[in-house]
A protein has these predicted regions:
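The conserved acidic donor/metal-binding loop of glycosyltransferases
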Residues: 88, 144-148, 232
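Long helical/loop segments within the catalytic core of UDP-sugar-dependent glycosyltransferases
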Residues: 100-139, 151-234, 245-246, 267-306, ...
């Protein structure tokens, strides 16, 4: 009973935190709007050298798009260096080499830095570190393979480094395929919530925020002063961000400067991505929280940093909540005790607390859509899907959370990019890279049936008060499990035709 009570209180506080984020957004969002007059003079002979790093690993479908959008950046050729940090193990290497040679012949300062064998260590962080050792830029912009920076990205972001305290500038992620399928529509809600509300709330309130691994630009001095890229976590971006902020560096975030990206259109890719983000953030919490708590910092910064670092703890809390539901129902029935025997004030107060906490995330995501889209009400139809996949990945993320807490190491499994840009693109024809089906799908269906069984138990015992949230959990687990099996069938069919291969882990 005590564990369940603590679990409920913890979930409540995570829910309340979403209200705080919305409040801080409304109060301070103007700080995260760029200044139109702050644009580079392209004729200035004193413009700084900028290095653009493009870390890739087996990106056959999208490497050409990545390079083409990067060479289109508006910046003097003699002040722009491009590094393709290639850890690929397939024909992407040859394709990349040909592309680099083509643009070199056109006068671009572009380099193909391919790591192979024993040199390919440290995942993405290792590649960024290797590239930085030979980079000539004073500033380093980073774009993952699924991103397409606008030509004016550098023109709009570099001017903010006039403030010597600024160590990094991050921009908002946009979407090129948000409307491709139900899954991408739901994911766009989640991404918009983070980038439109959370990042603005933190940066606008002068709280700590994080570089999101891509679509941002660093001052090289800041990276070096903060200890450089380290690869003992799966979220090297989160880790470096907090180490830099502990050193006193300031970050800027702009919600009106957008870098478009491709959203994973397959549930297996989404689950793999969430596993990495969850495990990496908890690894970063284990690594840095002791330092943060000991640091001489205002409590408002410390408290938000704690919540930010452990935010993925909501998923194991969900699992605990589910698993304890049936035993508590039975204990309540066998003991003869009824919650209805409690004073009405306690009953009403408890109901109000639970309702306020659970509604918070829905308000949070709905508000992000309201700030972005005039037709936001029409888009609300996909909010329940976000809630379903958010609960359905609780099994995957609980495993990630436990592995991080227990110090279990795992390989960096990057998210496959399939160049799904238009609604007419056929997903089944882009099966070259796949994430294999794993045992999580079995646990997802088991949890779905457990929730369903607890629903029937609630009715049988005459205690239907928890049926609503159990039904949502059940739908979430069944939906994610169904999508996983559906994709597995596609992959099986593709493998019969020899058009698929499992994506190897990145060393």
């Amino acid at each position: 009973m005590a564990i369940y009570g603590i679990d409920i209180v913890a979930l409540f506080f995570f829910g309340i935190h979403t209200y705080i984020m919305v409040y801080l957004y409304k109060k301070n969002h103007a700080y995260c709007e760029s200044e139109p007059e702050k644009v580079l003079d392209m004729n200035d002979p004193n413009l700084p050298v900028v290095t653009v790093q493009l870390p890739i690993f087996n990106e056959f479908y999208v490497v050409d798009r990545l390079i083409e959008t990067t060479v289109a950046l508006k910046y003097p050729k003699d002040k722009l260096e491009i590094q393709l940090l290639d850890d690929s193990t397939d024909e992407t290497v040859e394709k990349s080499r040909n592309l680099i040679n083509h643009y070199k012949a056109l006068g671009f300062d572009i380099h193909h830095l391919h790591r192979a064998g024993a040199a390919r260590t440290g995942h993405k962080a290792g590649a960024l570190e290797a590239g930085m050792k030979v980079a000539r830029g004073e500033y380093i912009a980073i774009f993952d393979a699924d991103f397409m920076p606008d030509p004016d990205f550098l023109i709009k972001t570099v001017p903010y480094f006039e403030d010597p305290q600024i160590g990094m500038v991050q921009v908002r992620w946009g979407h090129i395929n948000a409307d491709y399928n139900v899954l991408t529509k739901a994911q766009s809600f989640g991404i918009d919530g983070h980038f439109m509300i959370e990042q603005v709330a933190r940066n606008g309130s002068h709280l700590w925020m994080n570089f999101n691994g891509t679509a941002g630009i660093w001052k090289k001095e800041c990276i070096l002063d903060s200890g450089g890229w380290e690869h003992d976590t799966l979220t090297e971006d989160f880790d470096l961000s907090y180490r830099a902020e502990m050193r006193g560096w300031k970050f800027r975030y702009f919600k009106d400067i957008v870098c478009k990206a491709e959203i994973p259109a397959m549930i297996s890719a989404y689950k793999s991505q969430q596993f990495r983000w969850c495990k990496g953030s908890i690894q970063t919490a284990v690594k840095l929280l002791p330092r943060i708590l000991r640091a001489d910092l205002p409590w408002r910064i410390k408290s938000e940093a704690i919540v930010h670092l452990i935010n993925y703890s909501v998923h194991p809390l969900m699992v605990i909540n589910i698993l304890f539901s049936a035993p508590l129902l039975l204990m309540d029935y066998w003991s003869g005790f009824s919650f209805y025997d409690l004073p009405i004030e306690i009953l009403m107060g408890t109901a109000a607390i639970l309702s306020v906490g659970s509604v918070g995330p829905m308000i949070f995501y709905a508000y992000s859509q309201k700030t972005l889209h005039k037709d936001w009400k029409r888009r609300m139809v996909y909010l329940p899907v976000l809630i379903m996949i958010g609960t359905g990945i609780a099994i995957v993320n609980t495993r990630a959370w436990l592995e991080a807490i227990l110090g279990i190491q795992s390989s960096f499994k990057r998210t496959p990019k399939l160049k799904i840009e238009k609604n007419t693109d056929v997903l089944k024809e882009r099966m070259k890279y796949t994430v294999p089906l794993d045992f999580h799908v079995v646990l997802e269906f088991l949890m779905g049936f457990y929730c369903l069984g607890t629903v029937f138990l609630s009715f049988a015992l005459g205690k239907p008060q928890i049926v609503g949230f159990l039904a949502i959990y059940a739908l979430g687990f069944f939906y994610v499990g169904y999508l996983s099996l559906k994709e597995a069938a596609w992959k099986f069919g593709a493998s019969k035709q020899g058009s698929t291969e499992e994506l190897p882990a990145q060393a």
